[in-house]
Amino acid sequence: MKFTKMHGCGNDYVYVNLFEEKLDDPARVSIYVSDRHFGIGSDGLITIGPSDKADFRMRIYNADGSEAEMCGNGIRCVAKYVYDHKLTDKTEISVETGAGIKYLTLYVEENKVSQVRVDMGEPILTPGDIPVVKTDGSAYGDDYRVIDEPISAGNREWHMTCVSMGNPHAVVFVDDVAGFELEKYGPLFENHKMFPKRTNTEFVEILSRNEAKMRVWERGSAETWACGTGTCATVMACILNKKTDNKVLVHLRGGDLTIEYIPETNHVFMTGPATEVFSGEIDIM
């Protein structure tokens, strides 16, 4: 199997071009190639193929083989791959994802894509669509918004704000994100009974009205160095809690992303880098 390893702010995936390759069991392949000791090493597998609705279709598989609806860092790398590998010469493209069609603008330097701006669409705040439920398993009302909501995890009380960007996110504000015990608390949020489909969790430190630091515990992949949808969800949570303005620079372990919310259209835009690491071939056992 031919592959290309790429990353967006350190959020790394193995990319497979389905115009050239065939994968019978991508979930199993994702588990195999993601292993950082016995495989290639990545946060998961992303396939790039044809779409009858958009220019391209991407599918995302986590390191545990589960399929994700959307990946903001991953879709930027898809844009870089299809342009740099001559699958398109357009600098504005559409990509079909499990969370709908996304529209991307490619910024090209010396015939290579360096940055990508993604229209991530509208944030989803309806609890049943995220999904998130009450601690007793009952549903919130459709008009309710899970903002600064109490939650118990690890014998502690927290406050979270829940947003979906096509996949579920719980955002928690902390005083010191660098020293935060993510490995301890991340799994407790991911598998909490309030999240019927599990959740991604962002722990966020506010630096100013237009700057924040974030670490993320991804559903199915543990801590990753960046999460594009999570960064968008984080900025929406910041705005909903009146902690920042509508355009925020977010510092992640693997780099920086700029997120902008446009109230007039209710759309979130993400701008950030995409990097190709190497290409190769691997025998799938």
PLM segments and residue spans:
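A glycine-rich beta-to-alpha transition motif near the start of alpha/beta enzyme domains, typified by
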Residues: M1-K112, A170-M285
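N-terminal, positively charged, Ser/Thr/Ala/Gly-biased leader segments
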Residues: M1-K22, V118, D136-V163
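Hydrophobic alpha-helical segments and helix pairs
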Residues: K90-D142
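Anionic-ligand binding region
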Residues: V132, G137-T161, V172-M194, R198
